Amino acid sequence: SEMCIRDRDYTDKQVLVTTDLLLEGIHFDLMYVPLKHLGYKSAVVNFSDIYAMNGRPKQITVSLGISKRFCVEDLEEFYEGIKLACDIYDVDLVGGDTSASRTGLAISITCLGEGEKGKVVYRNGAKETDLICVSGDLGAAYMGLQLLEREKSIFNGEKDFTPDFSGKEYLLERQLKPEARKD
């Protein structure tokens, strides 16, 4: 979700809050998404929501539903990605929760940020005459996903198949390790 809400006002800042829920088999496929990349991406999509409101992400909480097939090393790899994202974007991981899951991995991340009063941008403030600008490129992440899905379907039919992504690294990176646009 790209939904952000405004919490309460204080001083010259507004508190911004956003939450995303990512479910295995719906939002990601662990057959081709490394856990470190998943941790990174899970955090960055939340940071992006705050940046989209002209805010700055400050803190996150991470809550996980974990099935029995995951070991401690898997979780360490996932949190390496979270930590990398937090370090790059100067965001603090301040808490979270864990629970057992019968159906795979569930990830819920809440990001708290702040924006200057009067400069926070809301979706409902858009008007017909507004200019919409895009930073980055459109469709590269989707093309990366299509490549991964194509190679997965071939692999499922031929177990000795080795995917070849040469020349497609940029598309894969847009899918597996996207960056929040803060410019």
Pin down the residues of each PLM region:
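Helix-biased detector of long, well-ordered alpha-helical tracts
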Residues: 1-2, 6-183
